[in-house]
UniProtKB/Swiss-Prot annotation:
Keyword Secreted: no
Name of protein: Deoxyuridine 5'-triphosphate nucleotidohydrolase
CDD domains with a match to the protein in the record: trimeric_dUTPase
Sequence similarity: Belongs to the dUTPase family.
Organism, as annotated: Parvibaculum lavamentivorans (strain DS-1 / DSM 13023 / NCIMB 13966)
Length: 155
């Protein structure tokens, strides 16, 4: 098992009574994020509609880490609902509320209620890059072949 890191969480008033993110199984990579909507005021996503859903949480990640907000596979497979900017990135220096941009690609309206598990959050180490401008790049077998240049058939 990998070592745990400490992430400080600030619960905002509209998330009172909701559970904090947690791993559902011992092998889980992501923790579920929960909709912190007002009780009795569901959000309905019509087909093709998108909305920013509050989680009621702000986090302080350690330096050198990020959190990625990713879709829940069950929501995508069963309802066509996914995270629009997947993965959404929460930087270690961001201190605002974590919100999830959901979009409904399904054929039917999708209702989000208080406590609905809407996305998953994966905390990962970050590697920063330093770009070095050069005149030419090393040659490779692929070269400048772009989208679809390697075909679709298995080898």
């Amino acid at each position: 098992m990998n070592p745990l890191i400490d992430v400080r969480v600030q619960r905002l008033p509209h998330s009172d009574g909701l559970p904090l993110p947690r791993y559902e199984t011992s092998g889980a990579a992501g923790m579920d994020l929960i909709a912190a909507l007002p009780e009795g005021e569901p959000m309905v996503l019509a087909p093709g509609e998108r909305a920013m859903v509050p989680t009621g949480l702000a986090i302080a990640l350690p330096q050198g880490f990020e959190a990625q907000v990713r879709p829940r596979s069950g929501l995508a497979a069963k309802n066509g609902v996914t995270v629009l900017n997947s993965p959404g990135t929460v930087d270690c220096d961001y201190r605002g509320e974590v919100k999830v941009i959901l979009i409904n690609h399904g054929a039917d309206a999708f209702t989000i209620e208080r406590g609905t598990r809407i996305a998953q959050m994966v905390v990962s180490p970050v590697t920063q890059a330093r770009f070095e401008e050069v005149e030419t790049l090393d040659e490779t077998a692929r070269g400048a072949g772009g989208f679809g240049s390697t075909g679709t058939k298995g080898r």
